[in-house]
UniProtKB/Swiss-Prot annotation:
Signal peptide: none annotated. InterPro entries: Ribosome_maturation_RimP, RimP_C, RimP_C_sf, RimP_N, RimP_N_sf. GO terms for biological process: ribosomal small subunit assembly; translation. The gene is rimP. It comes from Lactococcus lactis subsp. cremoris (strain SK11). It is found in: Cytoplasm. This is Ribosome maturation factor RimP. Keywords: Cytoplasm, Ribosome biogenesis.
Length: 157
């Protein structure tokens, strides 16, 4: 986690009003600019007008962070929902995604594979179990959370 993400996450989290929750903070290059994405959610999903209201709350708060973690050139701010295909980065994200269809990319191969897609059967805080289709049969693959390079929920067609 880079410094901007950690600083913003720690600063913003207590200011997010209930029933909303801070899902993730992302700091990435977008075209020639830097973009700060603040992903918020609530049980049952979040509406676009709610993200607009949260943006109006969050934007002035970011200006009060001291020392200022942002580059002098400025940045773009996006307050959004994590979406249907949401990133899974933290243990609580995986715990909340049990029963959902997910994609997992690993740092190193497990069973000669580096990517898996299937239903997240369980998560115990350290290991996830994914039910994958291997040709014509299902099998459970146990994956240590520390081995996960990238993961997200997927829409199953």
């Amino acid at each position: 986690m880079n410094d901007v993400v950690k600083i913003v996450e720690d600063f913003i989290k207590p200011h997010i009003p209930k029933p909303f929750e801070l899902f993730a903070v992302e700091w990435e290059k977008f075209g020639g600019d830097m973009m700060l994405s603040i992903l918020v959610d609530k049980e049952g999903g979040i509406e676009i007008d709610e993200t607009a209201e949260l943006s109006e709350l969050i934007s002035p708060l970011l200006d009060t962070i001291s020392p200022d973690p942002f580059p002098t050139e400025g940045y773009l701010l996006e307050v959004a929902s994590p979406g249907a295909e949401r990133p899974l980065r933290k243990a609580e994200h995986f715990a909340g995604a049990v029963g959902e269809y997910i994609f997992v990319k690993l740092y190193q191969k497990i069973n000669n594979e580096k990517e898996f897609t299937g239903d997240l059967v369980s998560f115990d805080g350290e290991n996830l179990v994914v039910d994958v289709l291997d040709k014509t049969r299902h099998k459970n693959i146990e994956i240590p959370l520390s081995a996960v390079a990238k993961a997200q929920t997927m829409v199953k067609f």
